Amino acid sequence: LKKKMKAVKSLEHRFDREREDMTEFPDSEEAILVGFGEDTAVPAGKTVLDFSLPRLEVSGRGLSQNLRLYVRGPEHVCILGPNGAGKTTLLRQIAGELLKRGDIRAAYMPQDYGETVDQDLTPVEFLAKSWEKAELTKVKTYLGNMKYTAEEQGHAVRELSGGQKAKLFFLKMILDGCNVLVLDEPTRNFSPLSGPVIRGILEDFPGCII
């Protein structure tokens, strides 16, 4: 019996050592420590969008007609529809209208990140407004808070994963203080850990989202 007890104790010690060596995966993306500031709020009575389109089409094929979308204040509007319904085409046109405005700070996050990003740039080059030391330090700190490694910060955007590219868009919108966001499936490339955190950031966003 003593020999058996000694063997059991030895096995317990081995399991304890193995548990210490195991990597524990977090339940949430704790490293994402960024968010939009209060200065991105949109007044409740402000008209953000008064958009009408007689006909929505792609390559000459009609998808819909007599569209009207009116958005006021800090509304969060979701455009739903099956694949091929023209959601992306519609969002591009809405973004085109909003990006021309001087009374709001609009941003557009497309499904295809290459539409609006020079993929030969590094994340630091994409985000930095100048080459001053304080600006570069700020950008690198934000990238670190979004779980970019020092190595990833020096890679070309094209070499990054879809999730890292998506985070780059969010950082750009945050650093630019955008208060109106046009987002085309913004969370589709995020991991199961990052996704809920990003959705929480969007839910708390005090500006307007389409």
Annotated model-derived regions:
Residues L1-S59, R72:
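Coupling and communication elements adjacent to P-loop NTPase active sites across diverse families
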Residues V42-I210:
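ABC ATP-binding cassette signature C-motif
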